Amino acid sequence: MTEKFAVVDTETNWNDEVMSIGVVIADAKTQQKMDSRYYIITPEYRVGGMYSSELRLDGEGVHIAERKQALREIGQWLDTNHVRKLFAYNASFDRNHLPEYAGYQWYDIMRLAAYRQYNRAISDTADCYKTGRLRCGYGVEAVLKMLSKDNRYSETHNAVLDAGDELRIMQLLGHGISTYDIAVVTGKRTSGSIWE
């Protein structure tokens, strides 16, 4: 059986409530995308937010559901795919907004992407702390521009597209999944499915 992991991204509304969730499942060995899901959370998306225009309500594969249903369906899909590891850029943000998924093992992509030791695209002249972490300019957009050398790239702030971009960062960093053991956020998955 192919070992898999998922990359998760959330977008929030003006009330700091999750209004959309994007999840991309990838092969743990090749880090290639295998499948994805995109949920718009109702009624939260109706509140509006900074990136409401990027929700793409009529897009292909869009699921509009209440939070409980969306999280249950995503959780069942993750379980069906034997996914136990969730990756996110600034993972504590997404993990804190998805406490229902605290049982999964969370990893922060930024903990590698923002450090000279793990990101060979960070120049010798970049302003870094003694630890090797960039002092600024380590968001998804800046890091993906740096790694891809594509200055035209612009982060969309659409949860499923951003999850795909965060997977691309992992691919460009070129580290195996085990390297992210240093980037564990917290939490352990209990045995069995929490969706039964």
What residue spans do the PLM features occupy?
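Acidic, Mg2+-coordinating catalytic module of metal-dependent nucleases/exonucleases
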Residues: 85-91, 97, 128-196
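Substrate-recognition/cap helix-loop segment adjacent to the acidic, metal-dependent catalytic center
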Residues: 92-114
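Short alpha-helix plus adjacent loop in nuclease-associated cores
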Residues: 109-134
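Conserved non-catalytic scaffold segment of RNase H-like nuclease domains
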Residues: 2-100, 134, 140-146
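Active-site donor-binding loop signature of nucleotide-sugar glycosyltransferases
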Residues: 41-43, 109-111, 149
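Short coil/loop linkers at secondary-structure junctions
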Residues: 58, 104, 150-151
